[in-house]
Amino acid sequence: MERLTRWLLVMMAMLLAASGLVWFYNSNHLPVKQVSLKGNLVYSDKKTLGSLAKEYIHGNILRTDINGAQEAYRRYPWIASVMVRRRFPDTVEVVLTERKPVARWGDHALVDGEGNVFEARLDRPGMPVFRGAEGTSAEMLRRYDEFSTVLAKQGLGIKEMTYTARSAWIVVLDNGITVRLGRENEMKRLRLFTEAWQHLLRKNKNRLSYVDMRYKDGFSVRYASDGLPEKESEE
């Protein structure tokens, strides 16, 4: 009998606790009074982020649409990742990680530090431009880093880089000179270019417009006044 009584008391306590939770869930008590946005936000429109919070996060903290808010922030182009969580009794915390743009993707999008393409506006002159097929942005970013390391030793940078449909690489330097590397031995060809630049091409940099490295052991050049490439050391 004593055992049954104890069991009934436990059940009653559980029912009361459950009823209390249901009551709190359906009541206007425990309202959200504060939304805390956290993260190093440089490019995002904070007003827009605040509006997203107001749209989804309101009312009873137990019923507020955490999942909806999370999905809305994920759709915002500048946000790479988001975590939305309740902080009882009255606060919802939104932790945001912002994308860091490293290049332009064509004329209307950007590439972040992970090689992801996203559509957003950014007024920052001097960013390199990537041109390639869909799905090649991560590979282009990797190659950009490799090419830049080699070119930097000669004080050169990349203005634009193209990865063609035939998997060939074309690099436009920050001085306007175009370098064609082709689709094989790209790093070897780029190093050969930097050697030629150091010992031969630099002195004509103001006239030089095009260098074709797609030769076995040499290259061809085109000057601004030329109609056709002038071949050098072609084999």
Swiss-Prot record:
GO terms for cellular component: cell division site; FtsQBL complex; plasma membrane. This is Cell division protein FtsQ. It comes from Neisseria meningitidis serogroup B (strain ATCC BAA-335 / MC58). Keywords: Cell cycle, Cell division, Cell inner membrane, Cell membrane, Membrane, Transmembrane, Transmembrane helix. Residues 1-6 are cytoplasmic. Residues 30-99 form the POTRA domain. Signal peptide: none annotated. It is a single-pass type II membrane protein. The keyword DNA damage does not apply.
